[in-house]
Amino acid sequence: MRPAGRAPQQVRPLTLTRHYTKHAEGSVLVEFGDTKVLCTATVEEGVPRFLKGQGQGWITAEYGMLPRSTHSRNAREAAKGKQGGRTLEIQRLIARSLRAAVDLKKLGEFTITLDCDVLQADGGTRTASISGACVALADALNALVANGKLKANPMKGLVAAVSVGIVNGEALCDLEYVEDSAAETDMNVVMMEDGRMIEVQGTAEGEPFSHDELLALLALARGGIDTIFQAQKAALAD
């Protein structure tokens, strides 16, 4: 039995609280069970140098964990003087995922930065960041339209992500920390609302996984992500 008595295909209790902070164009507190991430979207005029004059926008991301978001305190990366490899990998994943949701040509020469700060970690922080940041991004784009800076919303659709894995021989969706740390196979899946995949990151921590197990995990992820899409739509409808 899973720690919270969840069914194998069940996502943890999910909450998306919009307008969580007052300054950012978009802000969302996303909670998957005990994992809590604050996602903010900041709009700035102009684009990176490599895009200047091309008439398109850019979406980037930063990710970080508060020192006591985990069981024991981790020093801030700023105090260490550099970001770790895990942090860089995750923020690139978040940015890639959210760029897929937007027509950058229609965005024009604006840059949107998504800041994902983990308040409390209990597994799935990168996937929670993507799912929460998507809602913050939607609010930021709506603000650009409402303020007359864009004629039409360039968002192509929602993006969501979930972790899946094999634990004690069983395929599970939305792993919490105790499951993730014991997983024989761990996978993160990012999808568009229409079912197309943006990213699949899968690793065999123990025994290699079979083709059939891969397909089963992807099907499990699709079901979990559909649940997240429903929550995103409900949050944006408020």
Swiss-Prot record:
Enzyme Commission number(s): 2.7.7.56
Top-rank EC class of the record's enzyme: transferase
Binding residues annotated for phosphate, in chain numbering: 86, 124-126
Organism of provenance: Serratia proteamaculans (strain 568)
An annotated Gene Ontology molecular function: tRNA nucleotidyltransferase activity
UniProt gene name: rph
Function noted in UniProt: Phosphorolytic 3'-5' exoribonuclease that plays an important role in tRNA 3'-end maturation. Removes nucleotide residues following the 3'-CCA terminus of tRNAs; can also add nucleotides to the ends of RNA molecules by using nucleoside diphosphates as substrates, but this may not be physiologically important. Probably plays a role in initiation of 16S rRNA degradation (leading to ribosome degradation) during starvation.
Keywords tagged on the record: Nucleotidyltransferase, RNA-binding, rRNA processing, Transferase, tRNA processing, tRNA-binding
Annotated protein name in UniProt: Ribonuclease PH
Catalysed reaction, written as an equation: tRNA(n+1) + phosphate = tRNA(n) + a ribonucleoside 5'-diphosphate
Xref: Gene3D superfamilies: GHMP Kinase, N-terminal domain (3.30.230.70)
Record text on subunit structure and interactions: Homohexameric ring arranged as a trimer of dimers.
CDD domains, per the entry: RNase_PH_bact
GO biological process terms held by the UniProt record: rRNA catabolic process; rRNA processing; tRNA processing
Family statement: Belongs to the RNase PH family.
InterPro entries attached to this UniProt entry: ExoRNase_PH_dom1 (IPR001247), ExoRNase_PH_dom2 (IPR015847), ExoRNase_PH_dom2_sf (IPR036345), PNPase/RNase_PH_dom_sf (IPR027408), Ribosomal_Su5_D2-typ_SF (IPR020568), RNase_PH (IPR050080), RNase_PH_bac-type (IPR002381), RNase_PH_CS (IPR018336)
Origin superkingdom: Bacteria
